[in-house]
Each structure stands twice: as structure tokens, then as C-alpha cells.
């Protein structure tokens, strides 16, 4: 079983999978009479049909026991999905490039620092949210609309991956 290495989350490293949502290193402009910096369009919400809409939700996640065997990844073929931590806690991001099925050798793991969110592009394979603390909260922005928008891929026993706590 391959043990996954954890990388720090950066815009450059995560670019094949979507956008990192963060203010550090991002452009802004002043609004509200100069009292507020607006970091504009840090990520793009993707939908696939005119009747689709972007929605905002909150997920409350529990920490999964570590080490964690990665048995499954999911993707959303009809829209992007963004996760922004609300409590400032680090979290893990497990991803693989879009395609018919994720390949174990292409799976990567990133550690968000608690001040960064991620926006998975449509079709990017990813593990469900991986909080490191119980009852951690995430703002989630994704697509709502007709049609199935969650495909799951289960790895064969010889393809499963192991993730240790950072």
C-alpha cells in the first residue's frame, strides 16, 4: 500500500485541480469608502446548464481516524465545489486529475493552513472533506440542479492508499 506524502497547499501546486481561495498574494481593490479590501473573483463557480444555480451551504465534519485508508474518491461532473474553513483550522485535501477513473499513482494530498480554501474544478476527483478536528465547519459553494452530480470510484484492494496525520 502506497503511503501518501502531504504537500503544503499553494496556488501553483493545486492549479491542475482548481483554485486556492486565499488572500495572501492575491490582488484586491478598496471599497466602502476605503475601509475594506475586496479580494475579487478568487475562484469561479462552474455549472453546466442555464437552469443550474450556485448555492452556499455549511458542512460540519468530524475528523476521521488516522492513519486513513483511501478507498474511494468522488467527482462532480456538472459543477465545481468549493470548501472554505470557517474556524481557521488546517484540513487535508486529497485529489486526482479529471478522467474516467482516478489513477492511484496520480493522487496527491495537500494541507490547507486554515486560512485557505479550495475550489475543485468540475470533474476533479477528490476525497470527501477531511477535517483534522471534530465538528470543524466549512463553507461550501457548489452547484444545485437537475441530474446526478456525484460519481464515486472505489479503488481495488491493491490500489488503496494510506494517509497519515500531518
Swiss-Prot record:
Top EC group: lyase
Pathway membership: Nitrogen metabolism; (S)-allantoin degradation
One matching Pfam family: Ureidogly_lyase
One example GO MF annotation: ureidoglycolate lyase activity
CDD domains for this protein: cupin_UAH (cd20298)
NCBIfam families given in the database record: PRK03606.1-2 (NF002949), PRK13395.1 (NF009932)
Protein name per UniProt: Ureidoglycolate lyase
Organism: Azotobacter vinelandii (strain DJ / ATCC BAA-1303)
Gene this protein is translated from: allA
Amino acid at each position: 500500500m502506497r503511503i501518501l506524502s502531504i504537500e503544503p497547499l499553494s496556488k501553483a501546486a493545486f492549479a491542475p485541480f482548481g483554485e486556492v481561495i486565499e488572500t495572501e498574494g492575491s490582488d484586491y481593490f478598496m471599497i466602502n469608502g476605503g475601509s475594506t479590501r475586496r479580494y475579487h473573483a478568487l475562484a469561479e463557480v462552474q455549472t453546466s446548464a442555464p437552469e443550474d444555480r450556485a448555492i452556499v451551504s455549511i458542512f460540519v465534519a468530524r475528523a476521521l481516524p488516522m492513519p486513513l485508508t483511501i478507498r474511494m474518491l468522488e467527482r462532480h461532473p456538472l459543477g465545481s465545489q468549493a470548501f472554505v474553513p470557517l474556524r481557521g483550522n488546517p484540513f487535508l485535501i486529497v485529489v486526482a486529475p479529471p478522467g474516467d477513473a482516478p489513477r492511484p499513482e496520480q493522487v496527491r494530498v495537500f494541507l490547507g493552513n486554515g486560512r485557505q480554501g479550495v475550489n475543485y474544478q468540475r470533474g476533479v476527483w477528490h476525497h470527501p472533506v477531511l477535517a483534522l478536528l471534530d465538528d470543524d465547519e466549512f463553507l461550501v459553494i457548489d452547484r444545485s440542479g437537475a441530474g446526478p452530480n456525484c460519481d464515486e470510484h472505489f479503488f481495488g484492494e491493491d490500489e488503496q492508499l494510506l494517509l497519515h496525520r500531518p
